[in-house]
């Protein structure tokens, strides 16, 4: 069963959110390439929610060292105020209109 890891991050400024997202784009495939899907959502001017889907708990745990490294970088370099995550089994998933989803990347 696939699992989801939901990470919440709160930054000091909107500038830090943008810089962190830009940095994330440069490492995502190398550091978190084992994710089946990743959706990042700006939940406010200084906050970000990241939803990552993995094939199993073992697969999700395999990138925890890189996640810890990423969290350290964003804490020091981009002034992250708070960060925590939840994870659990995916109990329902509907993506019949996945091709209609539009993502806008802001630099």
What are these regions (language model features)?
Residues 1-49, 55-69, 76-107:
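Short S/T/G/P-rich N-terminal loop/turn motif that feeds into the first structured element of a domain
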């Amino acid at each position: 069963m696939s699992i989801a890891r939901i990470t919440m991050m709160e930054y000091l400024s909107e500038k830090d959110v943008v810089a962190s997202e830009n940095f994330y784009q440069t490492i995502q495939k190398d550091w978190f390439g084992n994710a089946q899907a990743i959706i990042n959502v700006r939940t406010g001017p200084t906050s970000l929610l990241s939803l990552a889907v993995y094939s199993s708990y073992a697969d999700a745990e395999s990138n925890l060292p890189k996640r810890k490294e990423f969290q350290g970088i964003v804490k020091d370099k981009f002034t992250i105020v708070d960060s925590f995550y939840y994870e659990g089994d995916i109990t329902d998933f509907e993506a019949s209109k996945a091709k209609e989803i539009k993502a806008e990347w802001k630099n």
